[in-house]
Amino acid sequence: MPITNHTSRRNVLRGLGAATALTVAGCTDSTDAGNGANSEESTDTGGDAEITAAWVFNSEVGDLGWSWAHNEGRKTVASEYDWLETRFTEAVAPEESEQVFRQYADSGVDIIFGCTFGYQDPMATVAEEYPDVYFEHNTGYTTLENMGRFMGRIYEARYLAGQAAGLVSETDTLGYVAAFPIPEVVRGINAYTLGAASVNDAVSTKVRWTNTWFDPPSESEAASALLDEDVDVMAQHQDSPAALTEAADAGIWATGYDAPMGEQAGEHYLTSPIWHWEEFYGPTVEAVRDDEWEADAYWKGLESGICSIDDWGPDVSQDVRDEVAATRAEIIEGSLDIWAGTEFEGESDEFLFQEMSSYVESVDGEVPS
């Protein structure tokens, strides 16, 4: 598995070479920014880079999904700071990630971002070996002196999408194609359902699990099974738009995840909970540059801008838009507690983040063990 190590555009123009690569046998790299696997974009436009940051993604960047959203955040901060050099490697399986983290640490980067849950233990192993390198793990629970963790309260955006779903549903039955039965995903299902139930007492959510983050055939199959159960709004927690397009093709409302997916759903698009990871990456690389970085457990929500819902689909009524906008304002100002009235009311952030493992009342069935 290669890690790309792209020099700055300024140095390219000076004729000092386009890129070098640290490689693992059997893999190649590309230095043509934005074109294919392992490509790299450098945005050092003024002087030599003072800070070098590396990102490791579990899937290909592509044009949609989890890794795409993270890479958009990387590109945004790279374009904003002329003192920052960025590198990334995509499509790294968790079992391969330790080697990639170690290669980046050996290459002299200042900070490494690992962007999937399965990287937690491999990153912790490497972080202990390289105390002078900073590490940030996305979605996990572990922190070390030189390893922080970060996530956004995307469940707040899911609550808003769920409220919209409850307002447009005619069968009172929502479908949810879920990834893995971990607290992150369970939180999303619960928040989505609570949002719907806040405007529709009769609503229920049916869930199908794929046990994958990216497997379009499995996602389509799960969505198809839900269509047979009279759902008329579909939600998902995967990188691809497969569940969304299955729903749109069947003529029902659909909500995506991670990235804007209106083009894939057309007139049946409701909205999507989406990420703006630059809201974390920017302050973090600034802290590294200013020698103020500290390992912490970042978990902010709508108020920070790290997450939101996408633009509305073309057929979403103004009444729906207005009601959801009012709810969004209540969440941001702190007057609405999403978990109020549920078994999770009053639970700590630690519990909500690490231990939520059961459904709220309006979700059918039980969370798989």
What is the meaning of each model-derived region?
Residues 49, 150, 298-300:
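Generic detection of short hydrophobic beta-strand segments and adjacent strand-loop junctions
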Residues 79, 272-276, 292-293, 297-303:
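Functional cleft and adjacent loop/helix regions within the main domain
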Residues 142-164, 178-181, 266-279:
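Short beta-strand elements at the ligand-binding edges of bilobed clamshell
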Residues 214-215:
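Membrane translocator/pore-forming domains, dominated by Gram-negative outer-membrane beta-barrels
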